[in-house]
Structures are given as structure tokens and as C-alpha cells.
Swiss-Prot record:
One of its GO terms (molecular function) is ATP binding. ATP binds at residues 12-17. The keyword Transferase applies. Residues 4-203 form the DPCK domain. The gene is coaE. Pathway: Cofactor biosynthesis; coenzyme A biosynthesis; CoA from (R)-pantothenate: step 5/5. It comes from Bacteroides fragilis (strain YCH46). It is found in: Cytoplasm. It catalyses: 3'-dephospho-CoA + ATP = ADP + CoA + H(+). Keywords: ATP-binding, Coenzyme A biosynthesis, Cytoplasm, Kinase, Nucleotide-binding, Transferase. Belongs to the CoaE family. PROSITE patterns: DPCK (PS51219). CDD domains: DPCK. Catalyzes the phosphorylation of the 3'-hydroxyl group of dephosphocoenzyme A to form coenzyme A. This is Dephospho-CoA kinase.
């Protein structure tokens, strides 16, 4: 049975870079943001519920209007809870199906910016936090999303603080542009194999 890790971190922290490096090293990672978009696009029940909540224009032309949904989602914590209540249960089920086909592997991962807030943390065995200084995160996100600083800060304020995520994490990766990532990821993999060895020993005893 594979050990499941949850990779999280704030906007612009570099979660995707860490996930990509893990995949290069042979650890498959379920990218919840990408997979949730696929689930939303193909599940007629979700589409109807989102249209009822946000308005028909959220699926204008038959495609999800990601900008409109994001604007609604980040407008208030109530809106976020409403949207997440529609999408997250389906994504959890999809992740369970995905991971059930990878039981022969030692380590698999799930990447989610809201791993803890969404309840996805309940689906994994340990949490890996990707940390970057706030100023650097904002700079990265503004450049990547072509958004304003205020828009990015609004999204950051809507999520759990880095400090709280670090407290909940079993392992923290620093992605500040100075500390090399690969040695940290190799250290993470070694840490996970120690955990696997411990679990196997405990099971045999």
C-alpha cells in the first residue's frame, strides 16, 4: 500500500515545481486544481449546482468561466464554502479512485493549495508544506496570473496562514530562490521511506 503525501503551500509558493520534481523522481502526484477542473467540466450535476449558485454565465459557451468563478470564490469565505461544498466531495472521490490504481507504488502525492481547509488532508498520511516569503509569493503570482498585487493579496488572505500550515506539516520545503530544492526533495523521500519502514515493522510486529 502506497504512503500518501499531501503537498500544500500558499499562492506562489512553488507547489507545482515541487510536484514536478517529485514526478521526475518517480512519485506520481494528483494535481487537485487541474483534476477538479476536469471533474467540473464532465459532471453535469456539478455544472447545474454551480449555475444555480453563481449564475448561468459561469458556463457561458458551454465552458467554465474560470475568471468569473474565481471572482465569486474569493469574494467572501461564505462564497468559498458554497463552491467548495459542491466541488470537493467529488474531487475526493476522484482522488480515491486515482490512488486505488497506484497501490503497488511506495509513495504517491496530492497537490492542493487548500489541502487542510478542504479536508483533503484526511485523505493523506502526511503533509508537506512548500514555504516561500510573502513578498516573493506575491511577485511570482502577479507575474504568473497577470493579476494585481491587491487581487493576489485578497486570495492569500482567504487561505490559511503559512504559519498554521507549517505547524500542521510533517515536512517543510523552503522555496525562496536561494535554498536548492532537489536536496530537500531527496531528504523528503528519505524521510518517507523511513516512515514506510517504521509502518512495515510495526505491522509485522
Amino acid at each position: 500500500m502506497a504512503i500518501k503525501i499531501g503537498i500544500t503551500g500558499g499562492i506562489g509558493s512553488g507547489k507545482s515545481v515541487v510536484s514536478h520534481l517529485l514526478e521526475v523522481m518517480g512519485v506520481p502526484v494528483y494535481i487537485s486544481d487541474e483534476e477538479s477542473k476536469k471533474v467540473v467540466a464532465t459532471d453535469p450535476v456539478i455544472r447545474k449546482e454551480l449555475c444555480d449558485l453563481v449564475g448561468e454565465e459561469v458556463f457561458s459557451g458551454g465552458k467554465l468561466n474560470k475568471t468569473l468563478l474565481a471572482t465569486y470564490l474569493f469574494a467572501s469565505s461564505t462564497h468559498a464554502s458554497q463552491v467548495n461544498g459542491i466541488i470537493h466531495p467529488r474531487v475526493k472521490e476522484h482522488f480515491r479512485q486515482w490512488s486505488s490504481h497506484k497501490e503497488c507504488l511506495d509513495i504517491i502525492g496530492m497537490e492542493s493549495a487548500i489541502l487542510i481547509e478542504s479536508g483533503f488532508a484526511d485523505e493523506v498520511d502526511c503533509i508537506v508544506m512548500v514555504y516561500a516569503p510573502l513578498e516573493l509569493r506575491v511577485e511570482r503570482a502577479v507575474r504568473r496570473d497577470n493579476a494585481s498585487c491587491e487581487q493576489i493579496m485578497q486570495r492569500i488572505r482567504s487561505q490559511m496562514s503559512d504559519e498554521e500550515k507549517c505547524e500542521r506539516a510533517s515536512f517543510v520545503i523552503i522555496n525562496d530562490g536561494e535554498k536548492p530544492l532537489i536536496p530537500q526533495i531527496l531528504e523528503l523521500i528519505a524521510f518517507l521511506y523511513q516512515k514506510i519502514h517504521y509502518l512495515c515493522s510495526a505491522k509485522n510486529n
